[in-house]
Amino acid sequence: MILFPAIDLKDGQCVRLEQGDMARATVFNFDPAEQARAFASQGFEYLHVVDLDGAFAGRPVNADAVERMLKNVAMPVQLGGGIRDLKTVEAWLKKGITRVIIGTAAVRDPVLVKEAAKAFPGRVAVGLDARDGKVAVEGWAETSEVTALDIARRFEDAGIAAIIFTDIARDGLLKGLNLDATIALADSISIPVIASGGFASIADVKALLAPRAKKLAGAIAGRALYDGRLDPAEALALIRAARAAA
């Protein structure tokens, strides 16, 4: 199980939103590269980055901030937001991104996901963000009529590295992960699933390490890390201990 610290980018700054609402953004660091270095020094092994402006614009917007982070940390980085074509996928991977996350295009253009996964094995993930059970797109501004499971099943044999499943209703509110829905998704597909949205405390780490969550590949933590509700050292120690005992 991997715990991914999250850096969400808006106007070149590190922010957290509440329920994906750009009007409810809190700036936690004016320098995303500095925040990335802080997470690296705390012992995290994989960084999760989202270009929020890019998600709304449909193209990369905070590229400079992302590139500065890549120059400042050696750990792997997965990136989502505004990745809508094969050219953008290839460009980010060439710049040093370990894994790209395709969200809106996974709903609108599933062929793109399959082509990208074939061209770059193990380096393409799909982001499925659900509101009331239905997948939201365009930076969560629109809600589709399909479920996360419907979309995930389209990619069962496509070689997708992971599905990142976010419960929008919980995102940024520190209410705890929606493990019931996330585990149900993981149990229904063969693609590794990463939980996101609502990470609140060490209790979430313990729940992720429980037997019923054994199929989950990881989870993403944001606001809980920034406001001190989740101690990185304690969380990572629990994860290391679980790995050693496995």
Swiss-Prot record:
Reactions performed catalytically: 1-(5-phospho-beta-D-ribosyl)-5-[(5-phospho-beta-D-ribosylamino)methylideneamino]imidazole-4-carboxamide = 5-[(5-phospho-1-deoxy-D-ribulos-1-ylimino)methylamino]-1-(5-phospho-beta-D-ribosyl)imidazole-4-carboxamide
Source organism superkingdom: Bacteria
Record Gene3D superfamilies: Aldolase class I
EC number: 5.3.1.16
Keywords (A to Z) from UniProt: Amino-acid biosynthesis, Cytoplasm, Histidine biosynthesis, Isomerase
Ranges that cross the membrane: none
Classification via InterPro entries: Aldolase_TIM, His_biosynth, HisA_bact_arch, Isoase_HisA-like, Isoase_HisA-like_bact, RibuloseP-bd_barrel
The UniProt record lists the keyword Amino-acid biosynthesis: yes
Family membership noted in the UniProt record: Belongs to the HisA/HisF family.
PANTHER family referenced in this protein's UniProt entry, alphabetically: 1-(5-PHOSPHORIBOSYL)-5-[(5-PHOSPHORIBOSYLAMINO)METHYLIDENEAMINO] IMIDAZOLE-4-CARBOXAMIDE ISOMERASE
Protein name: 1-(5-phosphoribosyl)-5-[(5-phosphoribosylamino)methylideneamino] imidazole-4-carboxamide isomerase
Annotated organism of origin: Nitrobacter hamburgensis (strain DSM 10229 / NCIMB 13809 / X14)
Organism phylogeny: Bacteria, Pseudomonadati, Pseudomonadota, Alphaproteobacteria, Hyphomicrobiales
